[in-house]
């Protein structure tokens, strides 16, 4: 009987170890090993961010696809919508621009629809409501082609809703309002794993909203981007560019001046900010200090 009890204890310990290891694996945050991601916080963007996108897309030889699906139909169906979208990129020297839009996953699964993605060097998601992108593209052939674009060393960028959709967890994914952090759409396109991404954070005083997600999904890394600010992601690391700040929710605190004497809140209620030039390791969830 004692031997059976010992065996049972050992089996339970091994089971708990496997579960813990699986949990640890699931909570690893990283992006695609190839290519570049640009996650942009929305608002009016300086030319610096667009030119950075152009650089990673191949400069003057770039071939980009623009996905405006996050925008509402009452805009997209106007006669001038596609003209203005195209002009917005042409003024930065993008000569080969394809606008790709659907709200139908059947269409997004057709070879004809995904053809422009097969030769694209860059992809850009416009802002609006991120759940619209999920409805049209999630788990389709078009979605798979986006990963292949990264495999080729291309760049995927997106601003506002186009930022949030790049994460694995879809923040503000409710169809009724953007004020609900955990809505009826919770899955993003997953270019970065185990992450929730918010935007317009400081401009709209959203810096505390991320905790609504993290108290229910504590394994996630939370990132909030302010307007005219972006992170440029390569593999496990990103660098901040732009005019404002990126808010980090990783359960720790970091400051250039140190934090040992600061009276900080509990780990589940703390955040800190990074500015242009700062770098962060997603896998380790730590600021990179040179």
Language-model-detected regions and their locations in the chain:
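Bacterial Sec-dependent N-terminal signal peptides
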Residues: 1-27
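C-terminal and late-domain segments of enzyme folds
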Residues: 21-60, 71-83, 87-96, 170-172, ...
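Structural motif
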Residues: 39, 122-126, 157, 197
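Short internal beta-strands
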Residues: 65-69
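Short beta->alpha junction loops
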Residues: 99-106
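Catalytic-core regions built around general acid/base machinery
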Residues: 116-119, 141-153
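Glycine/threonine-rich flexible loop motifs
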Residues: 130-139
